[in-house]
Amino acid sequence: MRGRQDGDAVDRAGLRLKLLKQQAEAGDIALLFADESEALTHPYLAHAWAKRGADLRVPAPGQSRKLALLGGLDHGAARLIVHRSRTKRSTDFISLLEAIDTHYGPRPGRVSKPAVLVLDNGPIHTSKLTRAALAQRPWLTIEWLPKYAPELNDIERSWRDLKRHFLAHQTFSSVEQLDAAVALAVDHLNHERGSHLCHDQRIAA
């Protein structure tokens, strides 16, 4: 992946993101990192403890099915917003934008701060349909990442945490069961991060 990167573009993007993170941590902007992932009905295999020489087996009957996860990570609040879908299309990404509207969009009586959405150049982010939806949200500034630089997108760590700590070594009998498990996992992850953030803020005060 690194061999295909434009090193200068990655360095410049990294510096811009560093400044944006400082603004978000100061409370001046809302900074969101967005991207997609997927969860499977078959087990996600993470690190596990076992006796030396033991043969660990996780049952995985039938054919694995997928659930698309389209998410936005709020850098300042450490909150993960996830839209779950059977598909990963522009219309699904627009559903994520609508969820972001709920939390960050202008609304009567709400004091809104500038919002920045960090995106890669994936096809559902750059489609005609998505670009039209983004144009309808002038309050949302897009920070485009350079190609082949997933390490700049902080949401990737959240996807790993979600799967490793809440979905690992489990088999789900249906997509519906998986969907419910992911919804619960996102709630738990946000609760944990919110508790840690409050604790850190009390220490800083």
Which role fits each region the language model picked out?
Residues 127-137:
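Short, aromatic/basic amphipathic alpha-helical patches
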Residues 1-4, 37-39:
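Conserved short alpha-helical interface segments
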Residues 55-62, 138-157, 171:
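RNase H-like polynucleotidyl transferase catalytic core
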Residues 33-35, 71-72, 78, 97, ...:
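Mobile genetic element proteins and their domesticated derivatives, centered on retroelements
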Residues 9-99, 199-204:
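Extended, low-complexity cationic-aromatic segments
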Residues 97, 109-126, 148, 153:
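Acidic/histidine-rich, metal-coordinating catalytic segments
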Residues 28-29, 155-205:
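C-terminal anion-handling pockets and recognition modules
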Residues 30, 115-116, 141:
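The start of beta-strands in P-loop NTPase/AAA+ ATPase cores
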